[in-house]
Swiss-Prot record:
Disulfide pattern: 37-66, 44-59, 49-67
One GO cellular component term: extracellular space
Propeptide segment residues: 22-32
Pfam families: Defensin_beta
Protein name as it appears in the record: Beta-defensin 1
Classification via InterPro entries: Defensin_beta-like
Family: Belongs to the beta-defensin family.
Amino acid sequence: MKTHYFLLVMLFFLFSQMELGAGILTSLGRRTDQYRCLQNGGFCLRSSCPSHTKLQGTCKPDKPNCCRS
């Protein structure tokens, strides 16, 4: 019975969020901003977008710009 409680506690700590984004299951099923940018025909640049393109958002976590023509 102690083994069951131990496993239950370990699972609780494994899947709980100690702080924002620290949980293991938080990113499952989500697409990254960079992936969404590229899928929508954009590209990521660390500098500002060229004049013939439009800013669509960011490509986190580094936060470069997502530009699209």
